[in-house]
């Protein structure tokens, strides 16, 4: 009897553990175009939200240069067609606090051809009964390159150690959803790609849930002074992104 109880306990623990890791798995395919810099890119992302609060995603980003699916030009080595940009892994563990509140620590790791980025974060949520959802996140961005970013005083290069703040306002009405995400990034006296030590980004997104787990969406993005014109001055860039999510 004792052996049976032990076996039953082990099997129950295994089943509970397995059920906890079950959840929703989705694939997200997105294409984007920056209007002022005339850049094309895409991203494919696989996400899993487990029932126990654990979230995991992997994604691969590609640059498409002059065309979305152009090949490399053998006579022009600068025209590389479709090229790999980066791979990203995100993990977080969400804890429900009750009354619509939740919090999650997490980590984003980005792999590029030249270095690896580490981005630990803490994120919180508040869901309301009227369909409104609020979320806020603080993220610390660093990289394994001691000379990754340019100092504004002209003294040289230093390691990226920037502070990033995001807020999401999301609202759902039936199958229709919309969101607004302002983002702010700062590192004292270090160029954020804007000619300044600050960076702002604003994203407005709309989505619509179709049958069989399909959800198309569009994102309209303002990128703070990341485009450098012919005179060497920084100007805002703008992006249009079209994507679709399929829940498996």
Regions found by a protein language model. Give the residues of each.
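Cleavable N-terminal export/targeting peptides
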Residues: 1-26, 248
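Short glycine/proline- and aromatic-enriched beta-strand/turn motifs that initiate or cap beta-hairpins
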Residues: 20-74, 86
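Residue-level signature of outer-membrane beta-barrel architecture
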Residues: 48-50, 93-95, 124-126, 169-173, ...
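Residues that define the transmembrane beta-barrel architecture of outer-membrane proteins
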Residues: 38-42, 46, 83-89, 116-120, ...
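Detector for outer-membrane/organellar transmembrane beta-barrel domains
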Residues: 117-191, 200
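Transmembrane beta-strands of outer-membrane beta-barrel pores
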Residues: 31-35, 60-66, 107-113, 138-144, ...
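Repeated loop/turn-to-beta-strand initiation elements of outer-membrane beta-barrel proteins
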Residues: 24-27, 52-58, 96-105, 130-136, ...
């Amino acid at each position: 009897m004792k052996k049976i109880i032990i076996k039953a306990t082990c099997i129950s623990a295994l089943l509970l553990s397995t059920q906890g890791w079950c959840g929703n798995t989705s694939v997200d395919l997105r294409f984007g175009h920056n209007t002022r810099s005339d850049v094309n890119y895409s991203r494919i992302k696989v996400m899993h939200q487990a029932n126990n609060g654990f979230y995991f995603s992997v994604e691969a980003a590609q640059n498409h240069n002059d065309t979305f699916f152009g090949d490399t030009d053998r006579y022009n080595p600068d025209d590389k067609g479709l090229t790999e940009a980066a791979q990203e892994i995100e993990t977080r563990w969400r804890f429900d606090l009750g009354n619509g509140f939740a919090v999650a620590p997490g980590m984003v790791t980005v792999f590029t051809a030249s270095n690896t980025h580490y981005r630990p974060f803490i994120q919180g949520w508040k869901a309301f009964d009227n369909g409104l959802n609020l979320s806020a996140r603080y993220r610390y961005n660093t990289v394994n390159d001691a000379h990754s970013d340019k100092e504004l005083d002209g003294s040289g290069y230093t390691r990226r150690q920037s502070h990033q703040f995001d807020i999401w306002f999301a609202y759902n009405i039936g199958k229709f959803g919309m969101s607004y995400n302002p983002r702010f990034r700062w590192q004292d006296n270090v160029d954020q790609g804007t000619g300044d030590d600050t960076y702002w980004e604003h994203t407005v997104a709309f989505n619509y849930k179709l049958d069989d787990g399909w959800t198309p969406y569009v994102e309209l993005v303002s990128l703070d002074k990341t485009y450098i014109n012919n005179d060497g001055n920084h100007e805002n860039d703008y992006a249009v992104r079209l994507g679709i999510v399929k829940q498996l």
